[in-house]
C-alpha cells in the first residue's frame, strides 16, 4: 500500500500567476469556480502504457490543459477517477494473498487518492511553471458519506480495474467469485458496489482552501466511502463511489459556476460507435432525459456522466460541459465539447 503524509500549507500566503500578479477588480469578477472531473482511464493512455511513469505522463498532459484555465485566474477543484488504479492494487493483493493481508476497497481508494493526487500535484506545478503561473496545489484525503442501505450493495455495477477478454473474465468469476460485465464494447471489467454519495465529509476544508486561493484535488476516486453510525462515528465501507456523482455533489455544494467532465471523447454522441453516430454540441435537460430513456448512454461509461451533469445543471442552473482533456480550455472559452443547459 502507498502511504503519504499531507504537507502543511501556509494559508496566509497566496501566490498568484505571474501574468495576473495583481488582478484587477474586473478580472476578479470574471474569475469562475470550476469543478473538473477527470476519468481514471484518462490517466492511462492505453493498455500498453500502465506503468507509474506512463501514468504520470498522462496526468501531465491533462494537467497542461487545466494549467491554462488556472492562469486565466479561475479557481479550480479537480476530482479524479481511479478505476484502473484500484484494479491494479486489488490485483497485487490477489497475487500476494499467500503472504500479505487483503486490502479493503476503502483503503484502496485512499491509496489512489495519495498516489494520483501526488502525480497531479507535481504535474500541475510543473505545467503552471512552464507558462509563468504559480499557485499552490493541495490534495485532500476525502471521505464521502453513503447509505449502508444503498441498493448497489446488493447489485454491484461500478467497473474497476483493467479491461479483460471474455475468457479472462470467466476465469475470474470461476476462480475468485468476481462480478463482471461487458463495458461499452471495449471488453470485460470487474464490477463492485457503487453507492450514491450523500455528503462530503471534508467539504468545508475544500471550501477554506479555495477561499485562500489554493488549487484543490479532492474526492479522488469518488471519495473514500464511509457510513455514519447512530453516534455520528464514521466507518469505511467496501465500495467505490462513482467520481462523476461525487464531483457533481462537490460542484453543487460549492455552488460552482461551471462543472466540466473530462472523458475519452470530445463530445457526447448518439448511436456511439455505429455508422450513424452523431456528436452533440449541446443538450438540454429534457433531451438528456429522452436520450437516456432511449438507452443511448452505456451504464458505467457515459450514462453516469450525463446523469451527474444533469443533476448539477438542474440544481444550480449553471453550465455543464462534457469533453476530452485536449479540449478542456477550448470547451470553456470557445464552445467545444457538449454543453448541457436547462
Which positions does each model-derived feature cover?
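C-terminal catalytic "cap/lid" subdomain
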Residues: 26-342
Amino acid at each position: 500500500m502507498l502511504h503519504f503524509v499531507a504537507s502543511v500549507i501556509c494559508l496566509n500566503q497566496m501566490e498568484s500567476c505571474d501574468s495576473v500578479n495583481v488582478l484587477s477588480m474586473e478580472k476578479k469578477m470574471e474569475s469562475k469556480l470550476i469543478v473538473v472531473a477527470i476519468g481514471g482511464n484518462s490517466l492511462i493512455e492505453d493498455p500498453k502504457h500502465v506503468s507509474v511513469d506512463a501514468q504520470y505522463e498522462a496526468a501531465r498532459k491533462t494537467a497542461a490543459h487545466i494549467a491554462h484555465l488556472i492562469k486565466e485566474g479561475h479557481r479550480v477543484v479537480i476530482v479524479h477517477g481511479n478505476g484502473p488504479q484500484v484494479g491494479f492494487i486489488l490485483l497485487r493483493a490477489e497475487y500476494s494473498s499467500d503472504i500479505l493481508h487483503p486490502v479493503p476497497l476503502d483503503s484502496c481508494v485512499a491509496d489512489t487518492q495519495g498516489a494520483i493526487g501526488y502525480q497531479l500535484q507535481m504535474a500541475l506545478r510543473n505545467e503552471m511553471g512552464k507558462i509563468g503561473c504559480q499557485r499552490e496545489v493541495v490534495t485532500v484525503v476525502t471521505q464521502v458519506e453513503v447509505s449502508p442501505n444503498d441498493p448497489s450493495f446488493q447489485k454491484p455495477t461500478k467497473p474497476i480495474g483493467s479491461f479483460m477478454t471474455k475468457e479472462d473474465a470467466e476465469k475470474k468469476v470461476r476462480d475468485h467469485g468476481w462480478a463482471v460485465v461487458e463495458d461499452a464494447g471495449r471488453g470485460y471489467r470487474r464490477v463492485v458496489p457503487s453507492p450514491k454519495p450523500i455528503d462530503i465529509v471534508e467539504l468545508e476544508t475544500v471550501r477554506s482552501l479555495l477561499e485562500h486561493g489554493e488549487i484543490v484535488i479532492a474526492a479522488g476516486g469518488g471519495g473514500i466511502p464511509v457510513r455514519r453510525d447512530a453516534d455520528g462515528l464514521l466507518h469505511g465501507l467496501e465500495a467505490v463511489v462513482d467520481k462523476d456523482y461525487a464531483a457533481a455533489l462537490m460542484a453543487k455544494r460549492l455552488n460552482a459556476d461551471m462543472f466540466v467532465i473530462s472523458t475519452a471523447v470530445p463530445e457526447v454522441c448518439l448511436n456511439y460507435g455505429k455508422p450513424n453516430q452523431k456528436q452533440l454540441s449541446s443538450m438540454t435537460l429534457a433531451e438528456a432525459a429522452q436520450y437516456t430513456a432511449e438507452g443511448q448512454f452505456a451504464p458505467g461509461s457515459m450514462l453516469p456522466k450525463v446523469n451527474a451533469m444533469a443533476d448539477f445543471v438542474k440544481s444550480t442552473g449553471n453550465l455543464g460541459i462534457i469533453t476530452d482533456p485536449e479540449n478542456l480550455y477550448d470547451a470553456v472559452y470557445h464552445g467545444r465539447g457538449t454543453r448541457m443547459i436547462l
